[in-house]
Regions:
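Divalent metal-coordination and catalytic microenvironments
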Residues: 18, 28, 54, 66, ...
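Core dinuclear metal-dependent hydrolase active-site scaffold
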Residues: 2-6, 16-19, 95-124, 128-129, ...
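Metallo-beta-lactamase
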Residues: 111-230
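Active-site metal-binding loops of divalent metal-dependent hydrolases
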Residues: 29-30, 55, 79, 111, ...
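Rhodanese-like catalytic fold shared by cysteine-dependent sulfurtransferases
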Residues: 142-144, 155, 202-239, 243, ...
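Conserved beta-strand hairpin/beta-sheet module of binuclear metal-dependent hydrolase folds
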Residues: 1-46, 117-132, 138
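Active-site neighborhood of phospho(di)ester-bond hydrolases with catalytic His/Asp-centered motifs
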Residues: 26-27, 47-56, 74-79, 106-109, ...
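Active-site metal-binding motif and surrounding structural segment of the metallo-beta-lactamase
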Residues: 33-75
């Protein structure tokens, strides 16, 4: 028996490859499915099943592509309603895989079709459970994350989830392993642990959903308190996962269209496309195409694109190192952004060589900022998450989380003297680029973010505030 967790940090997502005696299964695969096919080829195994724990909101699953390429059977749990051929399993239905079995455990609450899969070894002993977005390490899945079930309240879903966790998962043996669908950083939970596998026994001690510390009513209140709004692209991803999507190879082929620097702006204007710059924040700050948006490929790239661009159909033109074009298109496609219509030929170097117009981000060191921070006209915007802000922040700073920047709900004024920072510089440059594209030209970025600010003489709050965000 072989179990391999394939964890993608950018999405904080775990897919699973399971193999026994020449037969294999994949649970919650990503859209770029070659990695699973290669694993099966290594041992001359056949992928027999693709198990889906639910209709995912935060990424596009590779279930359809994998099934088409391997003739594997797609399997969902009860209540799933896909628009394509799939086996809708019954609760407690058993699937044979070589010498092992996987048993369907319907565990609704995160969504109504949410399902876990219990693996038993060749001796019939419970070995592990794949919990999808039902049970995370240290947490559970947020109910109704894609706002899909308008007829069921978040409180009702939370109550259903409580029963699923306590009646279906908690009675299982302490020594079995828990393999969740996500880890820390995912928008599908609140307070997940950084670890990606644990024993159920340890979770029964540490996880508030399992340790008996909360009544059902209190569990519902805690889970539904301060629920963040789901990113606006989540419902689109659910729809794609339920109804179907283009094969990734088609998306890549469509996106790999080299566009000369002389035609790049006109193409963006004609197609109403966003010019997305994927280089480092340092390089972007030094020079970039006017009105382009920075979201660096080496940060939390795909989720930030989804949360900030919102519309999965939005045409996108890429500015990225030539050798990373296919990687960029693939990572965008993982979150449903399939409409890449081209990239800047030869990268940003060609723009510089053509001596075309550039824009820059104004910056200031934390040390230099310390000399003006107390001036009355200075406006300080901290674009970190509320939990980060309430832990520690510059005195008199205003918290505007990055995801709230595009709509300018806080009515940032164009004539204010704005100084902006995040934790290390990645998010604040994103925010700066978005506002700059909207006509804000008076924003100065504090280099190094809060980590540099803490090392300076700038006054910050002297408390650490626990948070449930």
């Amino acid at each position: 028996m072989k179990i391999e967790q394939l964890y993608t940090k950018c999405l904080a997502q775990g897919a699973y490859y399971i193999e026994s005696n020449g037969e294999a299964a994949v649970i919650d695969p990503l859209r770029d499915v070659k990695q699973y096919i290669d694993l099966a080829k290594e041992s001359n195994s056949k992928i027999k099943y693709v198990f889906e724990t639910h209709f995912h909101a935060d990424f596009i699953s590779g279930h359809l592509s994998l099934a088409n390429l391997t003739e594997a059977q797609i399997v969902y749990g009860p209540k799933a309603d896909p628009d394509y051929e799939a086996l809708i399993a019954k609760d407690k239905q058993v699937f044979n895989l070589g010498e092992i079995t996987l048993t369907v455990l319907h565990t609704p609450g995160h969504t109504l079709e949410s399902t876990s899969f219990l693996l038993k070894d060749k001796n019939g002993k419970e070995h592990c459970i794949f919990t999808g977005d039902t049970l995370f390490l240290g947490d559970v899945g947020i109910p109704d994350v894609a706002q899909r079930y308008m007829g069921v309240s978040k409180e009702e879903l939370a109550g259903i989830l409580y029963d699923s966790v306590n009646l279906k998962i908690k009675p299982l043996p302490d020594n079995i392993l828990v393999y969740p669908g996500h880890g820390a950083g995912s928008a599908c939970g609140k307070n997940m642990m950084k670890e990606t596998v644990d024993t159920l026994g340890n979770q029964k001690k540490m996880n508030y959903a399992l340790n008996g510390s909360l009544s059902k009513d209190n569990f519902i209140k805690q889970l539904t308190n301060n629920l963040p709004e789901p990113p606006t692209y989540f419902p689109s991803n659910v729809k794609l996962n339920q109804q179907g999507y283009q094969d990734l190879s088609v998306v890549i082929e469509n996106g790999k269209q080299a566009i000369s620097c002389n035609d790049f702006i006109s193409k963006a204007t004609a197609e109403n496309a966003v010019m997305l710059d994927l280089r480092s924040q340092i390089d972007f700050a030094k020079a970039h195409i006017p009105n382009s948006i920075f979201i660096g490929i080496d940060g939390g790239f795909a989720p930030w694109v989804g949360g900030l661009l919102k519309n999965v159909a939005k045409p996108i033109l890429l500015i990225v190192e030539p050798e990373r074009i296919e990687e960029a298109i693939t990572r965008l496609a993982r979150v449903g952004f399939d409409n890449v219509i081209g990239y800047l030929d030869e990268g940003f170097d060609s723009w510089i060589e053509a001596n075309l117009k550039i824009a820059k981000i104004s910056t200031i060191s934390a040390q230099d900022f310390s000399e003006i921070v107390d001036k009355k006209e200075v406006k300080i915007y901290d674009v970190r998450k509320p939990s980060e802000f309430f832990s520690e922040h510059i005195i008199n700073a205003i918290n505007i989380p990055l995801l709230e920047i595009p709509d300018n709900k806080h009515e940032i004024q164009k004539d204010d003297n704005i100084y902006m920072h995040c934790a290390g510089g990645y998010r604040s440059i994103i925010a700066n680029s978005i506002l700059k594209s909207k006509g804000f030209h008076n924003i100065i970025d504090i280099v190094g973010g809060f980590s540099s600010i803490k090392d300076s003489s700038i006054k910050i709050t002297d408390y650490i505030c626990p948070s449930e965000f």
